[in-house]
Amino acid sequence: CDAGGCTGNVCGFDEPRWFERKSAVFSAGLRDMDAILGRDDRLVAKLVDAADKIDANFAAIVGTPVPAVIGTDYQALKRMCEKKTDLPILAVDTDGMELYDKGEEKAYLALFTAFAKEKYEVCKEKVGILGMTPQDVSDLKAADKVREELKKEGKEAICYGMGDGLEAVERASEVGKNIVVSAAALEGAKYLEKTFGTPYEIGYPAAGELVPNLDYQGKKILVVHQQVMAEAIRQEILKRENSAEVQTATWFMRKKELACPQDVSLREEDDYIDLVKNGGFDIIFADACMEKMVPDFQGIFVNTRHFAVSGRLCE
């Protein structure tokens, strides 16, 4: 829903899966005065035209700063579009000013409230994986790795948005439980629990491969990542060596129910630099781009990729 231009960043940089495959993201392409004067009929006409040209199961109107500033009524846009096309329309009232995971949180809720309506018979062997995006897990093979881990337990992983599509969302009520792998998906898991009674747990099934074999005994360790991944790494370290002292930090969404008292939120680079300078850490787990920020750190730095931080994936 941007006035024109911002979509290039999304398609060209923010979604690494589109480096190798087609996407179906369109800019509203409106002139300044169209946006300011609220000529919504032109946006509706463009959406209907795009829907006629591609094979789509639904359309989503996603907000950016300009429509946020002029007070765009997304629900009205949704109703106008649904009258002109047979496609279901989602409206996600993002404003382009929050961090990426806030938009993810709204998108998950919009998807499940719109499409997960029918109650199916529960299959205990199926496990829903919520929060699986390249921005959060930083590995395009992560879904396959999680599937392999759960297969060892006789379970089938349903990775919403990373291999499993709209049909899986529609049948979300049939999974025996959900596993939340990013904080952005927590509200979606709560919605599914409230609506269908589906229990959820928080963690990352493939966390073991993120923790190298090091001497963790008595070590003070800092883990910087999105909150659930950081917590999963902490639990994996403590499982191997419970004498370690592990603190987590994140640049992004931080849910109180997932945090320990010593965990911190980071806003500026100086926050991270000061934390490392004064923390006395022996080992740091963080994206490699953050190693240069602390040149005086004398301990072990473990490269733990976070695509949302560096724009780089696990190799």
Report residues per predicted region.
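An N-terminal assembly and electron-transfer interface module characteristic of large anaerobic redox
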Residues: 1-315
